């Protein structure tokens, strides 16, 4: 096999695709290089589908190797383990735009493996992985209606849209968006933003689609040089006689069942109709198997529901295309949590809780970009009971990780800075009922629970899921889609944001792309729905509570001179250990002089704060202090006025009259009130007792 390479310019980056040198036994393999990022994508496709298989078994695995940045993995085994959250999210990012481009009816197993071989810590390798996957599929011969292109977009007021920004570029960006699509249409969007307008978000999608054309053209040219012959595969012809039998015998009953608005009752009735069809059409000698009938029945269901929407009839639950389901909001329903909310929208329901912790509770991660500390976590749980099913319980699945990340993107932009609110925040969304858009219910619940916990959000956030039914003779954009509309429709378009703008946008297309008009309509309807939901939420709670929950840890933060850190710690940690033992508080010190104090109650944190103030305080001229005489000398007395700080009361400053001996007036251990006269350049403190008037002594309080 000969080696083929293709080099092209993609914005400011030079991209090289190579095949024929590495992983030659895979069905398709491409090494993509963008700057320092080198990602190997391999594709293997089974030549035939497993007997009786009724789904497309596509799996995508993105894996980061520590050697890619010259590191040895941590831990006892010193090798990579289970996929990180970043690897899981990127695997989903690659999967979503390629899945709709395999032809309907293709059931052969396909596995994509993307391995980051080399990169630098300022670059995300996901775009290289997506381009490598696109190229590997396009040259593999597997039926695939690509290629796709992919691009990351940043945005700021000075530069406008920025193509494929690095991590450092994204630090000042108002947008982080990844877009994938074909030559003609957009297939996938994943983004988080700082309250951008609908026009700015749509502009970013269109900008990315325009810029990715260079990559799509290059992959097409690359495939022309080295692609394997396309597999001789054709979809199995539809069984017309079975379709006709179902249409004539059961279409009316299916349509009647879809008039039932309550989900479980509707499913039960559809089950009755399906069982009747199977019983009537499947016989031992018959030409139809049970799998044939149930498969054709599902296709008829889909066709009926979609046709109803296109024809302008009411949706499954009786709504029109723009109406949001009834909303119910409760906060503070769980007594011992720091913040809680119950958000219900139709038959979708989430209980969100907010827990406040210390900086020691923050999430530590160690990836290719190095170690990082995350003080905000949002975890999404989707138990099987939420859809009335029995199911596997245990570890977190890819879907839960993806939905949790989307909900996190939705609220990230409104979080206070650590300086404003130095707590670690963990939000957990428990989906207790699901019938569409549970991730957007999690956004609403997260916003509500944090406000209930006293987290000073910049603004409340709400989310909504939009859907699409598109046929040759028209299309309809649906607001607040049900689970069935998601399953039977062509688009899942989720938007989260505040009253001012969008904070997260996710789009997945199940057909071969949509155009600008559809996206514009979807964004417009989403704005209307989001505004409505925010109004409903504001009826219950519109701002953060003025105080954090009494169940939350008490926290105080002060800034001290970094030179004073050693004084707070003390010899061998004696001072800080003493403060902790006396007050019960925990203390964290940063190199920049930031001191964080955590305690179970305010009294403990205040006591620790006072002690640190005393240790780090500087003597102020003309200020009164109550001190203790620590040593006597012929020329005066040394008085301790602050922890670790002694000053001298000269014999002439002890009393108005002339005294013969210091011991006539003072003794060691005696408490006295003194005034600071001066602090010289070497830090020596001059004190006076005689300059303190009787009135000042009487008025002085510690």
Swiss-Prot record:
Keywords: Cytoplasm, Magnesium, Metal-binding, Nucleotidyltransferase, RNA-binding, Transferase. Transmembrane segments: none annotated. GO terms for molecular function: 3'-5'-RNA exonuclease activity; magnesium ion binding; polyribonucleotide nucleotidyltransferase activity; RNA binding. It comes from the Bacteria. The keyword Transmembrane helix does not apply. Mg(2+) binds at residues 486, 492. It is found in: Cytoplasm. GO terms for cellular component: cytosol. Its cofactor is Mg(2+). It catalyses: RNA(n+1) + phosphate = RNA(n) + a ribonucleoside 5'-diphosphate. HAMAP family: PNPase. Component of the RNA degradosome, which is a multiprotein complex involved in RNA processing and mRNA degradation. Involved in mRNA degradation. Catalyzes the phosphorolysis of single-stranded polyribonucleotides processively in the 3'- to 5'-direction. NCBIfam families: polynuc_phos, PRK11824.1. This is Polyribonucleotide nucleotidyltransferase. It comes from Marinomonas sp. (strain MWYL1). The gene is pnp.
């Amino acid at each position: 096999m000969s080696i083929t390479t293709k080099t092209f310019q993609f914005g400011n980056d030079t991209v090289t695709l190579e095949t024929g040198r590495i992983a030659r036994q895979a069905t398709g393999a491409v090494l993509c290089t963008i700057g320092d990022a080198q990602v190997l994508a391999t594709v293997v496709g089974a030549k035939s589908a497993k007997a009786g298989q009724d789904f497309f078994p596509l799996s995508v695995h993105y894996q980061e190797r520590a050697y890619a940045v010259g590191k040895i993995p941590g831990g006892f085994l010193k090798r990579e383990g289970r996929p990180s959250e970043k690897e899981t999210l990127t695997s989903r990012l690659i999967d979503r735009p390629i899945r709709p481009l395999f032809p309907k009816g293709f059931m052969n197993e396909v596995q994509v493996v993307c391995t980051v071989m080399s990169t630098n810590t300022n670059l995300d390798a996901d775009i290289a992985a997506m381009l490598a996957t696109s190229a590997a599929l396009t040259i593999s011969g597997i039926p695939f209606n690509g290629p796709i292109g992919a691009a990351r977009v940043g945005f700021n007021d000075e530069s406008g849209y920025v193509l494929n920004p690095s991590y450092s570029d994204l630090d000042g960006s108002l947008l982080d968006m990844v877009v994938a699509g074909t030559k003609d249409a957009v297939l996938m969007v994943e983004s988080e933003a700082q309250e951008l307008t609908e026009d700015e978000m749509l502009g970013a999608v269109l900008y990315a689609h325009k810029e990715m054309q260079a990559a799509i053209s290059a992959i097409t040219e690359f495939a022309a040089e080295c692609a394997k012959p396309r597999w001789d595969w054709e979809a199995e012809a539809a069984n017309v006689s079975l379709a006709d039998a179902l249409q004539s015998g059961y279409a009316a009953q299916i349509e009647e069942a879809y008039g039932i608005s309550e989900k479980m009752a509707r499913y039960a009735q559809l089950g009755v109709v399906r069982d009747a069809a199977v019983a009537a059409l499947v016989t031992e000698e018959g030409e139809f198997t049970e799998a044939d009938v149930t498969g054709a029945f599902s296709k008829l269901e889909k066709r009926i529901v979609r046709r109803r929407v296109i024809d302008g009839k009411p949706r499954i639950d009786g709504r029109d295309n723009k109406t949001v389901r009834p909303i119910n909001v409760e906060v503070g329903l769980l007594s011992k949590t720091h913040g809680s909310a119950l958000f219900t929208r139709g038959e979708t329901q989430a209980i969100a809780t907010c827990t406040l912790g210390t900086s020691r509770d923050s999430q530590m991660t160690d990836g290719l970009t190095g170690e990082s500390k995350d003080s905000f976590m949002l975890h999404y749980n989707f138990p099987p009971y939420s859809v009335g099913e029995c199911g596997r319980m245990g570890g977190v699945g890819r879907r839960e990780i993806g939905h949790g990340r989307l909900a996190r993107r939705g609220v990230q932009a409104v979080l206070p800075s650590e300086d404003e609110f130095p707590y670690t925040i963990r939000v957990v969304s428990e989906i207790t009922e699901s019938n569409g858009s549970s991730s957007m219910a999690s956004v609403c619940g997260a916003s509500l629970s944090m406000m209930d916990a006293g987290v000073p959000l910049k603004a409340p956030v709400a989310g909504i899921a939009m859907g699409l039914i598109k046929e040759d003779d028209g299309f309809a954009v649906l607001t607040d889609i049900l689970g069935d509309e998601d399953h039977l429709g062509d688009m899942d378009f989720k938007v989260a944001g505040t009253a001012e703008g969008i904070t997260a946008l996710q789009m997945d297309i199940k057909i071969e792309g949509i155009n600008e008009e559809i996206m514009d309509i979807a964004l417009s309807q989403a704005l209307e729905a989001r505004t409505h939901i925010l109004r409903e939420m504001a009826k219950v709670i519109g701002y953060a509570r003025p105080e954090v929950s009494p169940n939350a840890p008490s926290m105080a933060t002060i800034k001290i001179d970094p030179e004073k850190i050693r004084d707070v710690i003390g010899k061998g940690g004696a001072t800080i250990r003493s403060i902790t033992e006396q007050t019960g508080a925990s203390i964290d010190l940063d190199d920049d002089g930031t001191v964080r104090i955590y305690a179970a109650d305010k009294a403990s944190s205040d006591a620790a704060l006072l002690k640190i103030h005393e240790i780090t305080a500087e003597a102020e001229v003309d200020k009164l202090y109550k001190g203790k005489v620590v040593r006597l000398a012929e020329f005066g007395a040394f008085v301790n006025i602050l922890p670790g700080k002694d000053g001298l009361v000269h014999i002439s400053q002890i009393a108005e009259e002339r005294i013969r001996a210091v011991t006539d007036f003072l003794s060691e251990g005696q408490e006295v009130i003194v005034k600071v006269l001066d602090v010289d350049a070497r830090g020596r403190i001059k004190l006076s007792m005689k300059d303190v008037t009787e009135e000042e002594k009487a008025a002085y309080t510690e």
